[in-house]
């Protein structure tokens, strides 16, 4: 069963200011939590298009929401192809788009997907099971320098060099095949006092490898720009991020698109190309409530930002 506790459910969907007959996009279908709440607010004229790379998520949602008929459309695709895929089904503009950038719990909890450092499994970490690059390829084929870079940039891991050295030395004799082997090497690369603080010692490196395998930051940056272009004036974009790298991209993109650039003084009117595209709905991110944090530990790092097209 595809079970997943949706984070910031009401805040994210309500933040889109739903029009009952509007057209909306859920870029991250997952377990269908946001989609379910959004669909419940649409009338017969409304429509929801939901993206996911995961075939299991798509099939589950088709069954779950079959009663909505043509109001609910699934697209099995990475959301980096948002504009193209919508155009393929005749949609050129929408009333709202949401992103929930957390890895869905079923992916984390299915050991053979290789996302979790709590289960021993083959090194995979692909969101899209048809994609060519796996965690095995990254860990066994990428150079010491490349590993240091991703561990530091994507995982903000202080002991990136030490961990990369352990990986480099180990794979000279044998390929690193499982998450369990990788966890042990990470632990060896982190000094004992540091291992005892800040959560699981493998957390940051696993995050870094997952981001690299799925090219997550570049994909999100491109998709967010596409979303801003595709939303109608008055429409909104809601984004839930789970770590500082994603949040920085969202914050920077929203700020850049909601700010008027420096113009020469004395211009009678501001040319259209210099007018801000967005109005910020959230100056500061919305965080989960204490009640939600008690019920769902995975919500603790979630941040929600919302912007409206001018």
Swiss-Prot record:
It comes from Bacillus cereus (strain ATCC 14579 / DSM 31 / CCUG 7414 / JCM 2152 / NBRC 15305 / NCIMB 9373 / NCTC 2599 / NRRL B-3711). This is Ribosomal RNA small subunit methyltransferase H. Pfam families: Methyltransf_5. Its main location: cytoplasm. It catalyses: cytidine(1402) in 16S rRNA + S-adenosyl-L-methionine = N(4)-methylcytidine(1402) in 16S rRNA + S-adenosyl-L-homocysteine + H(+). The keyword Methyltransferase applies. One of its GO terms (molecular function) is rRNA (cytosine-N4-)-methyltransferase activity. The lineage of its organism: Bacteria, Bacillati, Bacillota, Bacilli, Bacillales. S-adenosyl-L-methionine binds at residues 32-34, 52, 79, 100, 107. HAMAP family: 16SrRNA_methyltr_H. Its EC number is 2.1.1.199. One of its GO terms (cellular component) is cytoplasm. Keywords: Cytoplasm, Methyltransferase, rRNA processing, S-adenosyl-L-methionine, Transferase. One of its GO terms (biological process) is rRNA base methylation. The keyword Ribosomal protein does not apply. Transmembrane segments: none annotated. Belongs to the methyltransferase superfamily. RsmH family. It is found in: Cytoplasm.
């Amino acid at each position: 069963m595809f079970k997943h506790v949706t984070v910031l459910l009401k805040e994210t969907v309500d933040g889109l200011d739903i029009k009952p007959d509007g057209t909306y996009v859920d870029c991250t279908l997952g377990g269908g939590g946001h989609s379910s709440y959004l669909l419940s607010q649409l009338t017969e004229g409304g429509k929801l298009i939901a993206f996911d790379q995961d075939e299991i998520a798509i099939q589950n949602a088709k069954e779950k929401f079959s009663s909505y008929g043509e109001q609910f459309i699934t697209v099995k695709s990475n959301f980096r192809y948002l504009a193209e895929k919508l155009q393929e089904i005749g949609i050129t503009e929408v009333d709202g788009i949401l992103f929930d950038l957390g890895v869905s719990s079923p992916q984390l909890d299915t050991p053979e997907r290789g996302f979790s450092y709590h289960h021993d499994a083959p090194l995979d970490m692909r969101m899209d099971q048809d994609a060519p690059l796996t965690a095995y390829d990254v860990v066994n084929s990428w150079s010491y320098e490349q590993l240091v870079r991703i561990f530091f940039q994507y995982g903000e891991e202080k002991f990136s060099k030490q961990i990369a050295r352990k990986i480099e030395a180990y794979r000279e004799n044998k390929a690193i095949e499982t998450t369990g082997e990788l966890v042990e090497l990470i632990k060896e690369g982190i000094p004992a006092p540091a291992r005892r603080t800040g959560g699981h010692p493998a957390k940051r490196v696993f995050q870094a490898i997952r981001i690299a395998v799925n090219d997550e930051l570049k994909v999100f940056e491109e998709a967010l720009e596409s979303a801003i272009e595709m939303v109608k004036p008055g429409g909104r974009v809601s984004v839930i991020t789970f770590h500082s790298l994603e949040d920085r991209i969202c914050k920077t993109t929203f700020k850049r698109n909601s700010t008027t650039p420096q113009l020469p003084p004395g211009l009678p009117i501001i040319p259209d190309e210099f007018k801000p595209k967005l109005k910020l709905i959230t100056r500061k991110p919305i965080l989960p409530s204490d009640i939600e944090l008690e019920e769902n530990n995975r919500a603790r790092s979630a941040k929600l930002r919302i912007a409206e097209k001018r």
